[in-house]
């Protein structure tokens, strides 16, 4: 096991984090491949198994900073060919990748929604969200805040997603997900929980993959 140098004076929690980072093969892989985040490998692993990223798609990436998912999407969807579209949005400034438009702002802002729609020039094939609330250290609170972001992402998907489209979003396992799973099951033909290998075993993080989007009015008719 590798141990970081100059541990003296650091808190025990910092020492544990540094040791874990040094011994994590996915952290090394992220650095070696020039990826902006470990999350890029998670997206890659999920797509390797479920094949939802296809050439020349129209995609929206919510909470796109620092841009790891953007890198994978651009490459796998071959957006450097000038066909398809990738719109990323985040509160933080994010460097663009080939075939992308990056917007800095809040998806709550109606003007931001209109700007996203103008770049898409139609409906999106996929809406992705790796959004997570800033942690407080109080797990129930952190869980509820992240579930709130998931609900926002679902509402956003209703605005831009094409019939038959795909939705992938970060979630946390816990007591509040049943109502949100209900929202997804009403809108999509299939909903799955995913846990990519690059997501740490001890983490409560999971992802929800929903495929076969039905517009809300169509979903209501299907239930009647």
Spans of features found by a protein language model:
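Glycine-centered, small-residue-biased loops immediately flanking beta-strands
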Residues: 57, 84, 165
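Class I SAM-dependent methyltransferase Rossmann-like catalytic core
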Residues: 1-55
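Conserved SAM-binding loop of SAM-dependent methyltransferases across substrates and taxa
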Residues: 66-81
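Short glycine-dipeptide loop
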Residues: 80, 161-166
């Amino acid at each position: 096991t590798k141990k970081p140098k100059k541990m003296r004076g650091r808190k025990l929690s910092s020492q544990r984090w540094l040791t874990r980072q040094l011994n994590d093969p996915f952290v090394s892989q992220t650095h070696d491949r020039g990826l902006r985040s470990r999350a890029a490998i998670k997206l890659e692993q999920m797509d390797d198994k479920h094949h939802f990223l296809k050439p020349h798609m129209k995609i929206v990436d919510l909470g796109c900073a620092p841009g790891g998912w953007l890198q994978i999407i651009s490459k796998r969807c071959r957006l450097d060919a000038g066909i398809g579209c990738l719109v990323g949005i985040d509160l933080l400034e994010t460097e663009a990748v080939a075939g992308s438009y990056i917007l800095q702002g809040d998806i709550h802002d109606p003007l931001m929604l209109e700007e996203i729609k103008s770049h898409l020039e139609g409906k999106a094939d996929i809406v992705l969200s790796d959004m997570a609330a800033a942690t407080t250290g109080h797990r129930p609170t952190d869980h509820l805040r992240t579930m709130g972001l998931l609900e926002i992402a679902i509402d956003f998907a209703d605005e831009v997603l094409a019939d038959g489209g795909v939705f992938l979003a970060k979630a946390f396992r816990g007591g509040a997900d049943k109502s949100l799973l209900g929202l997804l099951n009403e809108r999509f033909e299939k909903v799955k929980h995913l846990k990519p290998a690059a997501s740490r075993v001890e983490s409560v993080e999971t992802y929800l993959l929903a495929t076969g989007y039905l517009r809300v009015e169509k979903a209501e008719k299907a239930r009647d």
